[in-house]
Amino acid sequence: MDGGLTALQERLKHSFSDTRLLQLALTHRSFSADHNERLEFLGDSVLNLAVSHLLYTRLSALPEGDLSRVRANLVKQDTLHRLALELQLSPLLRLGEGEARSGGPNRPSILADALEALIGAVYLDAGFSAAEALVRRLYESVEINPRMDAVAKDPKTELQEWLQGHKMKLPVYRVAATLGAAHKQTFDVECEVPELGLRERGIGGSRRAGEQAAAAAMLIRLKARGAA
C-alpha cells in the first residue's frame, strides 16, 4: 500500500480491512466515475449521529434547540475543513488533472467532503462503533461548550484575535495566483505572520474565501507548534 495511505491510517487510528474503501473515500468525481460522493452521503449521516450522541452525553443539561445549534457549528464545512487539514488529506486526494491544477487539493469543500467520505468508509469497513470512535478522536481537538455560536468565529477573526492577544501585528494576506476560467475563478491566497516568519496558503472561490482558508491553515500551523 502507498506509504501516504499507511500513514493516514495511523493518524486515523483505524486500519482498513478493505483498503479500496479508503482509496474511494479520497477519490473526487473529477478523477473517476467511481468516486466518493456516495460515501460522503453516508458519512454525513454517520457524523451527525455520532456528534449528536457526543453532545447528548457531554452537554446533558442543554435543551434540544441549543444542542442543534452546537451540532450545526461542529459539522459545518469550516470545521470539517480544519479537521481535514489536521489529518493532512490534501496530498492524498485523487483529483482529475484540471481540478488538481486549479487548486482542488486545498479547496475547503473538497477536503470537507473527503472527511465525510472517510467517516462513511470507516462505517462500512468496521461498523458504527468504529466510526463513532473516529469522530470522537477527531473532535478531541475542537472546543465544545454550550455557548458555541451558531456561526462561530471565522478563521481570520480567530487568527487576528490570537495575534493581538500575543501583542503581534495583524497577518498579511496577498493573492498568490488566480486560477481557472474567468467565470469560475479560484484564488490562491497566502497568509503571512511576519513576526513568526510563517506563511501558509489557502484556496477559495473568492478572495475572501481564500483568505479564510489560508488563515485556517495558519491556525493549524500554530497549533502544531504548540502556540495556538
From Swiss-Prot:
Ranges where the DRBM domain occurs: 154-224
Question: Can you supply a Gene Ontology BP term from the record?
Answer: regulation of gene expression
Single GO cellular component term:
cytoplasm
Cystine crosslinks = none
Question: Active site located where?
Answer: 44, 116
Q: Where is the RNase III domain?
A: 5-127
Binding annotation for Mg(2+): 40, 113, 116
Q: Which family does it belong to?
A: Belongs to the ribonuclease III family.
Q: How is this protein named in the record?
A: Ribonuclease 3
Gene name as annotated: rnc
